[in-house]
Amino acid sequence: MAFLKKSLFLVLFLGLVSLSICEKEKRQNEEDEDENEAANHEEGSEEKRGLFDIVKKIAGHIAGSIGKKR
């Protein structure tokens, strides 16, 4: 009977340890995904700002050339 108790405790302990390791890896993966998502959002914002600057420069050149023609 004592042998069965020890075996059962060992199985439960190993199960809890493996479950704990899986949960830790899952949390790390979620944190990595959140960081990647934040980085992608920042890159998108920078691209939009860069595009806006280009459009603004082109509009300025067009307005300047129209003003010179008058």
From Swiss-Prot:
Region span, Disordered: 27-48
Q: Which domain of life is it from?
A: Eukaryota
List the keywords (alphabetical).
Answer: Amidation, Amphibian defense peptide, Antibiotic, Antimicrobial, Cleavage on pair of basic residues, Immunity, Innate immunity, Membrane, Secreted, Signal, Target cell membrane, Target membrane
Pro-sequence residue ranges: 23-49
The principal location of this protein is secreted
Q: Where is the composition biased (Basic and acidic residues)?
A: 38-48
Residues bearing Isoleucine amide are 66
The cellular location(s) given in this protein's UniProt record come to: Secreted; Target cell membrane
Summed up, the tissue specificity of this protein is: Expressed by the skin dorsal glands.
The biological process GO terms on file are:
defense response to bacterium; innate immune response
Tell me the protein family, please.
Belongs to the frog skin active peptide (FSAP) family. Aurein subfamily.
The protein here is known as Aurein-3.1
Provide the species name. Answer: Ranoidea aurea
Lineage in the entry?
Eukaryota, Metazoa, Chordata, Craniata, Vertebrata
